[in-house]
């Protein structure tokens, strides 16, 4: 199902859950020592000042994209709504794919999106790697209690014994080894005495469980790899399914909000927490996991593998290419953080899978930019218009609102002269029916200026129109008493040729022409939109100063911003953020 329209206020089933939890005082007695830790540490803390605790737990192995923005908005937003705290936690348990570069980029992206984790007097920025000692201690406790064992089988053997959805698994020959033996092997793993892949720690649960995730899942594996924060201190690393619940509990998380692919992992999440709480390692009340459908959108891919392929093979100009769905790409394109938050607020939080049409994001951008964006004029495909009866050396001032929604913003002023630039599409040698712009003999208004009558045009040797001639009606200037003395059906925009500012303008569109580029067995590269970027040399209204961060609505064309990477005062580069209307609508 594709959602093409959005309610003004989207539903969020998590609100009902949290309201019920708070009404039932489920977190009464919960304590917080001011930092994450086991039960013994939290017992000495004060009552938790946060009514609820959520978390956004990215793995630092790539750049955040629009799908992550949804999770960020859900977790930070719902914590704020209920007087709680949201932690930013880096799930850095896979050293071979993670890097400090991504940590820094994620912090920057979350801050840019408008969220802060310093909300209760603490810096609630955490790393899973800070809990490695706790995790190891807990692993030994689980072995001693008979809840875990070290398996010396190969990964292929373990996989073969796992069973299927219709057949139970088979017990490992190491499943019933003495706890002391498993402890010895685990310590050898920690001390680097075994090669990668030779031993794993597994939970002892039920190989006949209908949920395959409870068939003695792997908790630790040997990986002789340097970690970006801990260096070579560790050569065993926890699996995510084991680390995730432990991290939540150590941080006092109340509502662990995940996407739907983790739903089948919830029984193991609960099993781990219950075992460790019974052993006195984790404080009650324990976190609970809840799932919602991930943000699936038309016309984009969010797979890290596919995004990396686009970058490495040169289909886009880096992770911040304005066509990319990364937050840095959207930011460079000119999408505002408030527009992305608005879009996320308009999409429901539910357990039903749906695909959101990209037009909803574009509309959120328009709705966000429209009230406060200064208007201006640009000519993207210039054609010279000469007003033959206007004095050659004369210039006068025309005025227009900076923003029609904000009278207090005042007027902008720009020059009118004999030679102007107009859009090539605003002239026709032979006009089709219902074409009300310039053609020989027709009257149009130069917006904010005069009414003119087309008197002729000039072509080059190839037959291309190079110039249009017209005469102006002196008593028809906009804003003067005679402005309405002549009625016309057409208005066109223009800039003074002698005063206009030259600029490179990049007309960005959707990266993919297919609404479902990653659907089925498609080659997603074959779905790329060949017209996702067009570069033109344009002329801008002279008051349009291309300063960093500047954004305008160019009348009739759309919203544009200064490119943060390639633009300079001497050579402005502008990006089209979004058109005024959905150009992809059927």
Curated annotation (Swiss-Prot):
GO terms for molecular function: ATP binding; glutamine-tRNA ligase activity. It catalyses: tRNA(Gln) + L-glutamine + ATP = L-glutaminyl-tRNA(Gln) + AMP + diphosphate. GO terms for biological process: glutaminyl-tRNA aminoacylation; glutamyl-tRNA aminoacylation. Keywords: Aminoacyl-tRNA synthetase, ATP-binding, Cytoplasm, Ligase, Nucleotide-binding, Protein biosynthesis. A motif ('HIGH' region) lies at residues 58-68. ATP binds at residues 59-61, 65-71, 259, 294-295. The keyword Nucleotide-binding applies. Its EC number is 6.1.1.18. InterPro entries: aa-tRNA-synth_I_CS, Gln-tRNA-synth, Gln/Glu-tRNA_Ligase, Gln_tRNA_ligase_bac, Glu/Gln-tRNA-synth, Glu/Gln-tRNA-synth_Ib_cat-dom, Glu/Gln-tRNA-synth_Ib_codon-bd, Glu_tRNA_lig_a-bdl. It is an enzyme of class 6 (ligase). GO terms for cellular component: cytosol. It holds the Pfam family tRNA-synt_1c_C. Its main location: cytoplasm. A motif ('KMSKS' region) lies at residues 301-305. L-glutamine binds at residues 91, 240. It is found in: Cytoplasm. It comes from the Bacteria. HAMAP family: Gln_tRNA_synth. Monomer. Belongs to the class-I aminoacyl-tRNA synthetase family. This is Glutamine--tRNA ligase. It comes from Bordetella avium (strain 197N). The gene is glnS.
